[in-house]
Amino acid sequence: MEDYLEMLCRLCGTEGFTRVHLLAERLNVQPSSASKMVDGLKREGLVKAEKYGLLRLTPRGEEVGRYLLYRHGVLHRALCLLNHTESELEQTERIEHFIDRRTVENLARLLERYDLPPR
């Protein structure tokens, strides 16, 4: 569910809304799968569906989504620093679901020491 909310936050970022088919396309899933997950996010109070198939994040959805993007950025930068590459996306995607807030904040502080703020 976090991957969907993270992507919704990215997609809604510029215009404030997105659509299920764009979400499905970006996550490389079927629109029906994305629609089911959006239903779950709606039940959690993170997303609201509007007329014409528009999806918008609720204030709570925005808050959680922004944290997920932050966590992703911190972890990705830390892995890139450790491995000296920019291709750590797969590892980031795997690890980010198991890392707690305290660890994220500690990694962010460590990155600041190296003058590498999270993106």
Predicted regions and their residues:
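Short, leucine-enriched amphipathic alpha-helices that occur as contiguous helical runs
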Residues: M1-L5, G61, H72
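A short, conserved structural fragment
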Residues: K42-E50
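Basic, amphipathic "hinge/linker" alpha-helix immediately C-terminal to the N-terminal HTH DNA-binding motif
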Residues: G53-R71
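Key DNA-contact positions within bacterial/archaeal DNA-binding proteins
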Residues: S32
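N-terminal helix-turn-helix DNA-binding core of bacterial DNA-binding proteins
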Residues: M1-V29
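Append "Primarily bacterial transcriptional regulators
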Residues: L23-E25, L41, E88
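C-terminal regulatory/oligomerization modules of transcriptional regulators
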Residues: E90-R119
